[in-house]
Amino acid sequence: MKKFFTVAILAGSVLSTAHGSLLNLKAMVEAVTGRSAILSFVGYGCYCGLGGRGQPKDEVDWCCHAHDCCYQELFDQGCHPYVDHYDHTIENNTEIVCSDLNKTECDKQTCMCDKNMVLCLMNQTYREEYRGFLNVYCQGPTPNCSIYEPPPEEVTCSHQSPAPPAPP
């Protein structure tokens, strides 16, 4: 429980001073789920909040794992998703629109990572028993982020046949 309060205070101070994606994500989570982003999701399961390890505890935790993987991909591309600011709107507390005004590819992709996470959360059951979950109980193999990558067949256009392999 002590870890939860430390993380909540840290997240609260980061979110209150950030001018980027973390504030955008907080606004999205709260508008769409009706829950406090900090009190309900920081420290939920094994992946919601900072870091993560082990097997995700439930569907909400899987949403957070996927979001961590999405951010890792952005870091690998040289983006700074915790602080990259993007423009978005939320319509009817359910529809998130990433604005065409977003200037950089990093801004656009960060918005999409956050949007996909919040849409994922919207369709899952929140379990109080995983709020403030101690990571000492996060055991088992850590799922590889490659599980979220589309198979090669989905990358090609549907109206084109894949190129035949080159002869040896």
Curated annotation (Swiss-Prot):
Residues the record lists as binding Ca(2+): Y47, G49, G51, D68
**Enzyme nomenclature, EC number:** 3.1.1.4
Residues of the active site: H67, D114
Signal sequence bounds = 1-20
Copy out the cofactor comment. Answer: Binds 1 Ca(2+) ion per subunit.
Disulphide linkage map: C46-C138, C48-C64, C63-C120, C69-C145, C70-C113, C79-C106, C98-C111
List keywords of the entry alphabetically.
Answer: Calcium, Cell membrane, Disulfide bond, Glycoprotein, Hydrolase, Immunity, Innate immunity, Lipid degradation, Lipid metabolism, Membrane, Metal-binding, Secreted, Signal
| UniProt-annotated glycosylation sites, renumbered to this chain | N92, N102, N123, N144
Q: What class of enzyme is it?
A: hydrolase
Q: Which is an annotated GO molecular function term of this record?
A: phospholipase A2 activity
Question: Which reaction is the catalytic activity of this chain?
Answer: a 1,2-diacyl-sn-glycero-3-phosphocholine + H2O = a 1-acyl-sn-glycero-3-phosphocholine + a fatty acid + H(+); 1-hexadecanoyl-2-(9Z-octadecenoyl)-sn-glycero-3-phospho-(1'-sn-glycerol) + H2O = 1-hexadecanoyl-sn-glycero-3-phospho-(1'-sn-glycerol) + (9Z)-octadecenoate + H(+); 1-hexadecanoyl-2-(9Z,12Z-octadecadienoyl)-sn-glycero-3-phosphoethanolamine + H2O = 1-hexadecanoyl-sn-glycero-3-phosphoethanolamine + (9Z,12Z)-octadecadienoate + H(+); 1-hexadecanoyl-2-(5Z,8Z,11Z,14Z-eicosatetraenoyl)-sn-glycero-3-phosphoethanolamine + H2O = 1-hexadecanoyl-sn-glycero-3-phosphoethanolamine + (5Z,8Z,11Z,14Z)-eicosatetraenoate + H(+)
Cross-referenced InterPro entries: PLipase_A2, PLipase_A2_dom, PLipase_A2_dom_sf, PLipase_A2_His_AS
* UniProt xrefs under CDD domains: PLA2c
| Reported tissue expression | Expressed at high levels in placenta, testis, thymus and at lower levels in heart, kidney, liver and prostate. Highly expressed in rheumatoid arthritic tissues, including synovial lining cells in the intima, capillary endothelial cells and plasma cells.
Which protein family is it in?
Belongs to the phospholipase A2 family.
- The entry's protein name is Group IIF secretory phospholipase A2
Instruction: State the species of origin.
Output: Homo sapiens (Human)
